[in-house]
Each structure stands twice: as structure tokens, then as C-alpha cells.
Design a protein with these regions (language model features):
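Acidic, low-complexity mobile loops and tails
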Residues: 1-55, 83-106
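ABC ATPase A-loop
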Residues: 5, 60, 64
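Short, charged/polar surface micro-motifs in flexible loops or helix N-caps
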Residues: 30, 72-73, 79-80
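Beta-solenoid/beta-rich acyl/carboxylate-transfer cores
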Residues: 46, 64, 70-72
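Short, surface-exposed secondary-structure boundary micro-motifs
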Residues: 52, 58-59, 76-78
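Periplasm/extracytoplasmic soluble domains of Gram-negative envelope assemblies
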Residues: 58-61, 69
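Generic hydrophobic/packing signal
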Residues: 69, 77, 102-104
Length: 106
């Protein structure tokens, strides 16, 4: 069973059985405006809670995605890199950003 957790930074975390999928909320993408660029982390990058993991640039602003837990990146959404507008059109489905295996149970 997967649960979705929302952070105060307007990120969503879909908690799966072995990994957590990270993305931005519809509210966040509305505040950013048209997204033109997304920089995702490299595979196998290790993060600690509070680390900057990704960057989103739009016509209005730039924003960082931070990780609220320790973990290692196991998958990135390559389609999102090529089509950053997915963050505007489908932020909580096809616009997911990356998956992380948490160091500790989340």
C-alpha cells in the first residue's frame, strides 16, 4: 500500500514498500508558473535530511527540492528532464521527479 505525505515545502512523498517517490504539489507548480527546466539528482546519490536534491526553473522563479529524510536515489524521471512542462500538466502523476530508498523506515 502506498501513502502520500505532503511537506510544508509543497512537495509530495509517495511512500511505497521499498522506496519513496518525490514530486511537487499542484500548488507549488501553480506558484512557479511555466516550468522550463528541471535538474534532477544523479542515480546513487546519497542525501541527508535537508539536502537540496533537485532544482526547478520556471519563467517566474527558481526553486529547490529538499529531502526531508536520509536516503539514496534509485531512479529518476528521465522523461521529466526532456519534458519539464510535465510538472505543470501532471505534477502528481507523470511529473514525479525521483525515487529514493530511505536509510531508515519512513
Amino acid at each position: 500500500m502506498e501513502d502520500i505525505v505532503y511537506t510544508t515545502e509543497h512537495e509530495w512523498l509517495k511512500v511505497g514498500s521499498s522506496s519513496i517517490t518525490v514530486g511537487v504539489t499542484d500548488h507549488a507548480q501553480q506558484q512557479l508558473g511555466d516550468v522550463v527546466y528541471v535538474e534532477l539528482p544523479d542515480l546513487e546519490t546519497e542525501f541527508f535530511a535537508g539536502d537540496e536534491a533537485a532544482v526547478i526553473e520556471s519563467v517566474k522563479a527558481a526553486g529547490e527540492i529538499t529531502i526531508p529524510f536520509d536516503g539514496v536515489v534509485v531512479e529518476i524521471n528521465e522523461t521529466l528532464v526532456e519534458q519539464p512542462d510535465l510538472l505543470n500538466t501532471a505534477p502528481q502523476t507523470e511529473g514525479w521527479m525521483f525515487r529514493v530508498v530511505p536509510k531508515d523506515k519512513f
